[in-house]
């Protein structure tokens, strides 16, 4: 039953991506991106719905051409979550998705083209209340910056970002957020640290092209964890070569670890050893699969023996300590004994019961507040 995060977040300007606040005092938003063919409207809508079910706050969709722009409009009509259109090179695509109700434009002013084209995009965004994300990436730095620095560096990423920020400043447009991504953890972290000191706009965090499910999760947890622990970051996206739903799960796990967001079960489990009185690994795998639908923030401890079990169980909403028999704790107090027979079924029932009680209590607090 862990408390609020001790992290003091960086002060930033609040913007709105659809109905989701970003920056200021808003919760850190979890974002993902579709990896379907945008022209396949049904497949893209289905994937977005899976992301929504996983708890995503904002979804980015690649819009590489005008056909995709028209498909984007159809997708937008069929989903409720805010959508970001990822636009490069052709400013007319940005203008079209603005007409079709996009919630945010992800552009790089440097590759949109002439000043008049950037102005046209900014004017369309301003007229419709659409924010912009300036997305700087180590893999696509401007040629003059590559020549100046010799290779991507934190300073190069920040100079690129500030160049685009100044571009929007000249057009008197402040409704934007910024990202400075790199696949190298140290480069990305230092770039965000430098940028955070120089602008007030929200920062979208990510380690780009982080890798597959395991390696990408580790890189993202290390990099984003460092920044978030320093109070830097207003939205996050975990870039994984995997099912985008995994990006959302990992994102929430990172935020839960830092007590920055609470959603669903926060499991505390031992790695198990020969002292375990039940199969901890099997029990955890079954519980995680069965309880994915629970949204109520709940701490659940699953400890295989009495060495650390009672201590961890007393700190959880629901705790299981291995023994002969096993002992269940509810809100830190011993509640009942369980044998290994039907252990997972009984534990699931108790967790769901506690989740329902907590949801009711939380709702009552909101009403009284």
From Swiss-Prot:
Name the positions where [4Fe-4S] cluster binds: 270, 273, 305, 312
Going by the record, the broad EC class of this enzyme is oxidoreductase
One GO MF term: 4 iron, 4 sulfur cluster binding
Q: State if tRNA processing is listed as a keyword.
A: no
Q: Report which reactions are catalysed by this protein.
A: (2E)-4-hydroxy-3-methylbut-2-enyl diphosphate + oxidized [flavodoxin] + H2O + 2 H(+) = 2-C-methyl-D-erythritol 2,4-cyclic diphosphate + reduced [flavodoxin]
Q: Which cofactor does it need?
A: [4Fe-4S] cluster
Q: Does the keyword Flavoprotein apply?
A: no
What's one GO BP annotation on this UniProt entry?
Answer: isopentenyl diphosphate biosynthetic process, methylerythritol 4-phosphate pathway
> What Pfam families has UniProt attached to this entry?
GcpE (PF04551)
Know the name of this protein?
4-hydroxy-3-methylbut-2-en-1-yl diphosphate synthase (flavodoxin)
Organism equals Pseudomonas putida (strain ATCC 700007 / DSM 6899 / JCM 31910 / BCRC 17059 / LMG 24140 / F1)
* Gene name tied to this protein: ispG
């Amino acid at each position: 039953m862990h408390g609020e995060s001790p992290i003091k977040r960086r002060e930033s300007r609040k913007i709105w991506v659809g109905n989701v606040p970003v920056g200021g005092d808003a919760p850190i938003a979890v974002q993902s991106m579709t990896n379907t063919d945008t022209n396949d409207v049904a497949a893209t809508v289905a994937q977005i719905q899976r992301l929504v079910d996983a708890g995503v706050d904002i979804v980015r969709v690649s819009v590489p051409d005008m056909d995709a722009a028209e498909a984007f409009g159809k997708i937008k009509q069929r989903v409720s979550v805010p959508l970001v259109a990822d636009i490069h090179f052709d400013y007319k695509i940005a203008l079209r998705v603005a007409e079709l109700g996009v919630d945010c434009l992800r552009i790089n002013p440097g590759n949109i083209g002439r000043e008049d084209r950037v102005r046209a995009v900014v004017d369309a965004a301003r007229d419709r209340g659409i924010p912009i994300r300036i997305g700087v990436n180590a893999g696509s730095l401007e040629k003059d910056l590559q020549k100046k620095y010799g290779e991507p560096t934190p300073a190069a990423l920040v100079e690129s970002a500030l160049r685009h920020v100044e571009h929007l400043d000249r057009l008197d447009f402040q409704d934007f957020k910024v990202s400075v991504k790199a696949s190298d953890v140290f480069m990305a972290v230092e770039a965000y640290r430098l940028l955070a000191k120089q602008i007030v706009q929200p920062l979208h965090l990510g380690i780009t092209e982080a890798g597959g499910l395991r390696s990408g999760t580790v890189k993202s947890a290390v990099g984003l964890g460092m920044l978030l622990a320093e109070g830097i970051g207003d939205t996050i996206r975990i870039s994984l070569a995997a099912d985008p739903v995994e990006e959302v799960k990992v994102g929430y796990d990172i935020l839960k670890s830092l007590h920055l967001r609470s959603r669903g079960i926060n499991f505390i489990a031992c790695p198990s050893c020969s002292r375990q009185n039940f199969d901890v690994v099997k029990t955890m795998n079954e519980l995680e699969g069965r309880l994915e639908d629970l949204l109520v923030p709940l701490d659940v401890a699953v400890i295989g023996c009495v060495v650390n079990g009672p201590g961890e169980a007393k700190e959880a909403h629901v705790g299981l300590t291995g023994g002969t028999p096993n002992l269940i704790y509810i809100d830190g107090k011993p509640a009942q004994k369980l044998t290994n027979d039907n252990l997972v079924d009984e534990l699931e029932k108790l967790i769901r019961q506690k989740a329902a009680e907590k949801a009711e209590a939380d709702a009552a607090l909101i009403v009284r507040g």
